[in-house]
Amino acid sequence: MKIAVLLSGGVDSSYSAYSLKEQGHELVGIYLKLHASEKKHDLYIKNAQKACEFLGIPLEVLDFQKDFKSAVYDEFINAYEEGQTPNPCALCNPLMKFGLALDHALKLGCEKIATGHYARVKEIDKVSYIQEALDKTKDQSYFLYALEHEVIAKLVFPLGDLLKKDIKPLALNAMPFLGTLETYKESQEICFVEKSYIDTLKKHVEVEKEGVVKNLQGEVIGTHKGYMQYTIGKRKGFSVKGALEPHFVVGIDAKKNELIVGKKEDLATHSLKAKNKSLTKDFKDGEYFIKARYRSVPTKAFVSLKDGMIEVEFKEPFYGVAKGQALVVYKDDILLGGGVIV
């Protein structure tokens, strides 16, 4: 089978390509220029070329920087301006990697596209679904929730049945040169955030604009350093007059540059709504597992789909729901779809 492999210049994607080559597939390597300095791109492309030379496969470099900026980067900035907590990776995957890059791969005659994501694909009743990775500590299925079933059918995740701790030893044994490659230490899960998301925002918007802190009764009880520096659940970086116990951000009013704070129990909710992006029309209302944050434990809840909105009801209090985050619905370890929390 002819498969396109997205190569980042790192160990995971290189070993993904190696494992597919060992299975006898015809491969085409693809490096995506999305968002980085030219210096970084040059290094990553050089690393990807070394992997391709070792494997005896061609490498193509696709420049999607303009598309990425308008569809992902600018949306990230806009979401924070609106007081939301966005998920750029969940936006990038369907639009860039499994959108534009997949389209290009198909034009090259490839049947599928592979990446180093920690996830799996499982076919159920002739329909392809994303399945959680074997290594639950590294599972990235959450970020793939917006993919359509027709797209999922064209995906390959060679690392999905492996443990992260085993990848590097396996890769260095198979491709010894990987241990000598130069690289940049990535400090964040978001590729375009070098230090902190605040530093990224500062390049485009006024972040340090002091505002007031209010309690749930609407009374002014303190000040903050600028609403974009806070997310739901944060408990530091603002003042509360006469506070004898911790206070948490429970709401953000972007238009007024105000924070609403309360006690930990005020973070609790028994329901939430999300704008549906990928649950299909045949979705049956019932009890499922949901995630409302990437590194959260799946929580049982009653989920229903009504007029394009996903409605979730919890039996137990659920904490820290932030607008703009992805709500992802699972049946056991099978991802059914999800949406954006409103």
Curated annotation (Swiss-Prot):
InterPro entries: MnmA-like, MnmA-like_C, MnmA-like_central, MnmA-like_central_sf, Rossmann-like_a/b/a_fold. The active site is at C92, C191. Gene3D superfamilies: Adenine nucleotide alpha hydrolases-like domains, HUPs, Translation factors. The record marks H117, Q325 as: Interaction with tRNA. It comes from the Bacteria. Its main location: cytoplasm. Its EC number is 2.8.1.13. It is found in: Cytoplasm. Residues 138-140, 293-294 are annotated as: Interaction with tRNA. It catalyses: S-sulfanyl-L-cysteinyl-[protein] + uridine(34) in tRNA + AH2 + ATP = 2-thiouridine(34) in tRNA + L-cysteinyl-[protein] + A + AMP + diphosphate + H(+). ATP binds at L6, L7, S8, G9, G10, V11, D12, S13, L32, G116. PANTHER family: MITOCHONDRIAL TRNA-SPECIFIC 2-THIOURIDYLASE 1, TRNA 5-METHYLAMINOMETHYL-2-THIOURIDYLATE -METHYLTRANSFERASE. This is tRNA-specific 2-thiouridylase MnmA. It comes from Helicobacter pylori (strain J99 / ATCC 700824) (Campylobacter pylori J99). The gene is mnmA.
